[in-house]
Amino acid sequence: MQLVKSRRYRVYLLIAALLIGAGLLLTGVALRPRLAAGVEQIARLRTWFANPAARGDWTVLAGTRCTPDAPMLMPTDGYIGFGRGDSFRLGHRHSGYDIFTSAGAVNTTPVIAAYDGYLTREADWRSSVIIRHPDFQRVVGGEQIWTYYTHMASADGTQSFIAPQFPPGTHELFVPAGTLLGYQGNWSGTAGNPTGIHLHFSVVKSTLSGGYANETDIDNTYDPALFLGVTRNASGVLVCEGS
């Protein structure tokens, strides 16, 4: 199963703005702050895209260890536009990080392994790989976890940007931290409906049988901040102090 999600950002922004402007509560007062936060995140993303150099402190760099004791490396360059738990459409809670490149072109911004582990690319995965990390002592006290990387393909899904040494059907191939996995793309899972160019990165729990859980369910994931050492600054932006 390809664990990717369509992100129609302009549509989400319009819907959120209309709902907030109309004062619709729908499921109660908790919904409005969540939608408002989504609008703010999209506005910040646009600000960063307009002039990334002016917001260098918002930019993260691949291979960086954000704090000296962070167990994982930052997996790519860019701006963390959406974090775990963020919402940019009704009924949605984001399960990981969306890290957007300023490069302006697909197949340009490298994606690397955040930690040593065993890589799998299922036979039908165009843009995704997942890495198993057994006996992860830091943060989770020896549990097995997985890191998931997706959107590494063209908008129409015909060209994969995953590194050629990881063809479809790859299972349990050891990769050290920092290994090149591929490049950021904009495949959403639906041809003709591209995402912005970015990497979706998440830290996924194991199932009872030892496989990876369904990453699209936020309850099956951990906050990447715990592993990367990312923090929110005073403006609410997810930043990596080591970048």
Q: Where are the regions a protein language model picked out?
A:
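Acidic, glycine-rich catalytic/binding loops that coordinate metals and/or anionic ligands
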Residues: 44-46, 138, 142-145, 158-179, ...
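Soluble periplasmic/extracytoplasmic beta-strand elements of cell-envelope proteins
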Residues: 98, 130, 148, 198-203
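Active-site loop architecture of trypsin-fold serine endopeptidases
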Residues: 184-198
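Surface-exposed, glycine-biased beta-strand/turn segments
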Residues: 30-128, 132-136, 177, 186, ...
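Beta-strand/loop nucleic-acid-binding surfaces
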Residues: 146-155
